[in-house]
Amino acid sequence: MNFQLKNFLILKTLKTFYIEYYKVLIYYLINSIKNYLGDKLYLYYKKNKYTIYILSDFLFFKTTNLTSNITDTVQEFNSKILIFLPLKIKNLKNNKYKIIYYLLGEIPKYTIEKNLIINGLKKTFISKLMFNYIGIFFNKFIKNNNNILYAKIIFNDKFIINIVLEENKCYCIFNNYKYDLICFLYLLGISMQDIFIFSRYNKSFYLKKLLLTLPSLNINNIINYNIFKYLSFFFNLSFKLNTYYIFNKVLNKNNSLYSYIKNFSNSNNLIALDFINILDILLDIKYNKKNITDLDLLEYRSIFTLGNYFTNQYSFYLKKFSNILHNDIFKCIKNLEKYKLNTNSFKSKLYFNLKEYLTVNPLVQYLEQINSFSEIIHKNRVTNYNSKLKQNLQIRNINLNQLGSLCLIDTTEGINCGLVISFTKNIKIEKRNNFQFPYLPVLNIKTKNFITFINSFLQQTYIVLFNNYYLRKNKLFNFFNLSLNKNSFKLKNISIQNMIYIKPMDMFSFAENLIPFIFYNDPARVLMGAKMQSQIVPILKNKRSIIITGYEKNLLNSTNLILKAYQEGIVVYVSSYKIIIRDLYNRKITYFLDKYKRSNHFTILHSKPNVWQGERIFCGQILTSTQDILFSEYIGGNNLLVSYGNFFGYNFEDAIVLNKKIIYSQLFTSLHFKVYEIIFNSLNKFSFEISTINLPKKSFYSKRNLDFFGIIKEGSKVLNNDILVSKIFITNINISLLPLYNLIYILFGKEIKNIKDKSILVSFGNSGRIVKTELFSYSSKIKSYLGYYLKCRVYICKQRLLSVGDKLCGRYGNKGIIAYILPSNDLPYTNTGIIPDIISDSLGIPSRMNIGQLFENLFGLSCYFLNKRLCISNTFNLPKVYIKTILYNYINNIKEKSGNLWIYNSYSPGKILLRDGRQGYKLSEPSFLGISKYSKLIHMIKDKIHYRTIGPYTELMQQPVKGRNKKGGQRFGEMEIWAIEAYGSSYNLRELLNYKSDDIIARTSLLSNLDNNIILDNITTTESFRTLIREIHSMNLNIEAFSSIDQLEGKILPININF
């Protein structure tokens, strides 16, 4: 028998946030109801006395129970949880009681996949790093060229004490009150003699000078009754030495350093003598004996989850409207007694709906569902943004205490760079929402295999090793290695104690661990490669990559997108939509599969069974495979034979030349959904919309795919301008046609109606196959308010082949636009007839410093001929001599085993001589050839190209406005321009850079020239081109433009450009 037991109280992973959402939320909600609403309420009504007991411990929750199959289709309903507060009403006159449920509000349902379903759309909550505003913190600032030290004691959000130390004085700040520290200590029962007795600086000249500047300490001199009244509310003030507590303990792991008594961590109270020790620590910092508190440590931060967000909102709501809620409860009970209602539930007038807050909150984001991996990455993001802290460069920078907890590379681009980051792959979260990460202890110059967890505060007490040490010939260097000690890199002796080793793969997130040879790439390109992993489109024919990192299978443990067995058992039934397993207790467990569902980005979500009938299943075993998960391994592309070199300029910069064989074999064909929604309206009895097959003035061919009700049939193929749903609008005739109406009614006995055809047609470029049709009926409230009574939704699935303008990418930040597609017989080939699949420019490798793709090409080529797969761990960080030897041995091994002598060239190892496909001659220089993994990105040409008849331009630069919603113009990126330049389409470039840009004169005359069939005028110099010329002139470079040769004199005429 195989069971799994998880302890959610000690450690919790990111997948257990939904448990915290329900358990912690209910716990805090019950406490907030007790604090703000109380336990009892009293009501007098018609000479009757009622006692209302608020049963907050018995909160009643009711859910809508929408399944995951419906949430993708029904957008009018929310998957929500209703919160009912039980009220026990007791009549003291006859001692009868009744229990009613008071509807307090609703919260959205939080699924086990960490999804929020709002209006039928899947969203997710981005966690937030919040500063712990409880503790004692030391810092300094500069004022008038003087260092001013201060200690901030934070008890809660409302009460904060600042102890400020300047050159000649030391004072306290209590919110808005400023008071001398020695006078404050005198109010706590500490005299000057006690300060000299208990302070460590009793012989210091600075402390004596500080005390002598004060006036004589007596009650009449130091008492300010306003301050005394304010402080007596928080402290137990006394004019004798107070050794008892004056306030609750400040919960902080570092407080044992600041407390006067040594067992402060075991004590629950703060005593008055601790202020003397705080003053001593300020003097230690002044004399450079101690350092200030580093507030950037992760130990001072905790994770702010969705449950914390809702508890704050509900506590604010109950606190603000507690009196109004009491009156509302009284009115509900009066109506209950007045009208003798038998209902057992009432709805609050201040019905608290958190859906409004979630739609505005920037932390609740539209879920990225381009592929399975993008969803995992989006849910593991965390933001470092806090409105109470300054957004300076120090917050955005990488802190050394983040090693193992937060990824060092993965972050967003643009203005949020450094503010939105990702968790590492093996992070654990404590019960109090603090971080823990794994490490390996180092004993006797060897790393042990057992893994333990440590937090960032205890990390500073250890010496952290990063990379494995290599044996050298000189034994003196074998005992030293680069390490991290107290936020600085040093060379340390390995034989010393208190050393830990952090694996390199534990310092990165999920995306970086899928990149082999990561240490041979530029970090900026690694970030780009990690971002493109979440932009890969699921394709029909996936293949497992030859070079892997070994983390492709471990990634599936962090996702709930695939079905896993809950118990051990035997598979009883398997079909395309469900799997039935009989467990060891003779129970049947049914697992339902997702079939052809659309994601948030209109890509396909499809599951297939991985097991067969009669197979024995163990607990946690993977049961299904999705569109990009195959053989329990994440797959996002295909292996292609890549040639690096120049091909007649068609692969200019990052442009790509593609073999037409790739399109015929449909290696990168993807499926996409187009959804049409049709609403039928009913204004009144005489004006309504219906669907029927009896459409007027329509041929039989146009209605060939419609059923009896005029709705398209599932599985039919539709083309442009085909009818999807027939829709006619019926109204009464006009008053002017009333005599004709009466005549026809008398002759034929039929009424005449005005019929208008409003059928929905397939828009241009959206032809495909009908996957499914759905019909929804509206509720009575929506029907009466909006007039809608029926909605029809049609799903069209269409295939997208590779075309010119699509974007392909590798795993190392290498990406490019397809500029030219050639048949196989025009491409170069080897002596054995092997033709490359794509040709890429070789200049992008040294300029981007991503050497890892060259290693993948060579290792992939060798594994292809040897029929093997190679696992490259992220700890693979060998010197260049080692990896060069391994590569040459692999290539030489292919040459001996396969018999292909052309693979290994001793004069240029790794390069292969090719022949021209058009003429058959050998090329003058050898070309680099290898096998690498390429993927198709979602930036496809069909989504980029759009048109407009007329639209706005910016007033300042006269460029087309950005965005389709603003009717913006066509915008081309950097890579798209490179592809156009590589293709040699000069007229398109002229149109983009002049007519569609800020050439106002040419733009105004373009329309009249096209209408009158006149030759286009000569274009003028645009402002963007003039800006480019000025930037070139600033580098002491000159540009001159020349026209064609003068036919009379045979001279080249220059063109004058007015700058």
Curated annotation (Swiss-Prot):
Pfam families (UniProt xref): RNA_pol_Rpb2_3, RNA_pol_Rpb2_6, RNA_pol_Rpb2_7
Plastid recorded as keyword: yes
Gene3D superfamilies: 2.40.50.100, 2.40.50.150, 3.90.1100.10, DNA-directed RNA polymerase, subunit 2, domain 6, RNA polymerase alpha subunit dimerisation domain
Biological process according to GO: DNA-templated transcription
SUPFAM superfamilies listed in its UniProt record: beta and beta-prime subunits of DNA dependent RNA-polymerase
Primary role: DNA-dependent RNA polymerase catalyzes the transcription of DNA into RNA using the four ribonucleoside triphosphates as substrates.
Keywords recorded for this protein, A-Z: Apicoplast, DNA-directed RNA polymerase, Nucleotidyltransferase, Plastid, Transcription, Transferase
Keyword Transferase (UniProt): yes
GO CC aspect terms: apicoplast; DNA-directed RNA polymerase complex; mitochondrion
Catalytic activities: RNA(n) + a ribonucleoside 5'-triphosphate = RNA(n+1) + diphosphate
Protein name: DNA-directed RNA polymerase subunit beta
EC number(s) from the headed UniProt entry: 2.7.7.6
